[in-house]
């Protein structure tokens, strides 16, 4: 199996996996979505809320506000199923504001300087003149399989590597290139060919194939000039996070989690403990 990183930023990574199987790639995708630990606000104590927003809606917004959750930040915090949270192993947030103003995520005061909202400009609630807000909240580590707020990924998808072939026995069809909605194809009448600009951007929608078939049928032909398929064992994988942790860290933790599950299954099949 070969892996090639095509691009990487603070919140997105795109890489190619060659010589792999669909179940394996899909297992990594699922682990990245629901089995990587992340911290999010879970318990909210609203002592005063004079705004027009319902308490439940405000608590929901707080829970979905992404918090810095890299391994350095959440190290030492109990995972789900461990001991109950206490003052010395939990992260407390407080929010005390008075209108008129828009309360943003940056106004949340954390008991741990390493764990704070990823973005400062997420609007939480609007307070009018004289309205007050007083909240205390507890952030806990959890998994995406329990609630979406603990999912580190906003996008976690893969597709099989596209393959575009041309039927040289059929006359060249320049119009099929214009049918591509992503501009993957470009017709070059000077060199009498259709060029593939970026095959990895191909969505395999086959708009070009349908256009070529229509043109062929209008000329009394049976075959399409262009065909779109895919490599069964090559994949383009894309992970985008909400900023709570780097995408590469999400991928590594997902692989570790998958490896641990495989080890447990091996021990069980050999008659050992679960």
From Swiss-Prot:
It is found in: Cytoplasm. CDD domains: RNAP_D. Its main location: cytoplasm. This is DNA-directed RNA polymerase subunit Rpo3. InterPro entries: DNA-dir_RNA_pol_insert, DNA-dir_RNA_pol_RpoA/D/Rpb3, RBP11-like, RNAP_Rpo3/Rpb3/RPAC1, RNApol_insert_sf, Rpo3/RPB3_RNA_Pol_subunit. Belongs to the archaeal Rpo3/eukaryotic RPB3 RNA polymerase subunit family. GO terms for cellular component: cytoplasm; DNA-directed RNA polymerase complex. Binds 1 [3Fe-4S] cluster. One of its GO terms (molecular function) is DNA binding. [3Fe-4S] cluster binds at residues 202, 205, 208. Its EC number is 2.7.7.6. GO terms for biological process: DNA-templated transcription. DNA-dependent RNA polymerase (RNAP) catalyzes the transcription of DNA into RNA using the four ribonucleoside triphosphates as substrates. Its cofactor is [3Fe-4S] cluster. It catalyses: RNA(n) + a ribonucleoside 5'-triphosphate = RNA(n+1) + diphosphate.
